[in-house]
């Protein structure tokens, strides 16, 4: 393998396929009340590690054990379908987040009200502006009480008015999480929000 300047290590397999070893020798344990910051430059492996924790990527070696429901703010629009209406996407993303039908029903009115989409909630998401889609995804993701919360950088959503109430909702959402893992390149933000820290370089803890 060759060390990659962009992070991780790259090489080729016996079949000639390019492979990237994005993470190596990652070892840590988190318990209730932990707020972990994954700190590192772009390409250091932060987002890849978050995606492993979210279950989106499976590790090729080692063991990952998670007890509790994981809520991800890595991509608040993940699991949404542009051909479906906003209302249908509340149900779809709710299922993607592991919610029951009753839980989805209970959060629907809150999502509609907080997202401020009005009648647009009844039309296909492909007709939305990027800001509207982000507001919907954010409103769905933050409508539940997270047991384990994963965040890729600190989120900023919408125009100035919406951003203010989104910031308040996000702070409340984070405070309810039993465990939080946040990827960031901002040391000061990490110190203000987290109580545990891991620095990554080229996919390894340093």
Stretches found by the model and what they are:
Residues 184-185:
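H-loop/switch region of ABC-family ATPase nucleotide-binding domains
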Residues 39-41:
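The feature captures the beta-strand-to-loop junction immediately N-terminal to the Walker
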Residues 1-21:
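Pre-NBD coupling/linker segments of ABC/ABC-like ATPases
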Residues 101, 105, 111-127:
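Conserved ABC nucleotide-binding domain
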Residues 192-199:
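Conserved catalytic segment of ABC-fold P-loop ATPases
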């Amino acid at each position: 393998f060759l060390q990659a300047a962009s992070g991780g290590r790259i090489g080729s397999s016996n079949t000639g396929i390019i492979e990237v070893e994005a993470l190596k020798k990652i070892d840590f344990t988190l318990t209730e009340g932990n707020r972990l910051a994954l700190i590192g430059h772009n390409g250091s492996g932060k987002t890849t590690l978050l995606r492993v924790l979210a279950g989106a990527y499976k590790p090729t070696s080692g063991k990952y054990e998670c007890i509790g429901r994981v809520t991800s703010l890595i991509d608040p629009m993940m699991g949404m379908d542009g051909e479906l209406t906003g209302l249908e996407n509340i149900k779809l993303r709710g299922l993607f987040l592991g919610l029951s039908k009753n839980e989805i029903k209970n959060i629907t009115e809150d999502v509609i009200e907080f997202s401020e989409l009005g009648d647009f909630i009844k039309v296909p998401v492909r007709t939305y502006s990027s800001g509207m889609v982000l507001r919907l995804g954010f409103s769905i993701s933050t409508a539940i009480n997270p047991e384990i919360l994963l965040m890729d950088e600190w989120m900023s959503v919408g125009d100035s008015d919406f951003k203010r109430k989104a910031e308040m909702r996000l702070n409340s959402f984070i405070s309810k999480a039993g465990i939080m893992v946040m990827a960031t390149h901002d040391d000061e933000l990490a110190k203000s929000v987290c109580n545990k820290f891991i620095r990554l370089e080229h996919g390894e803890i340093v």
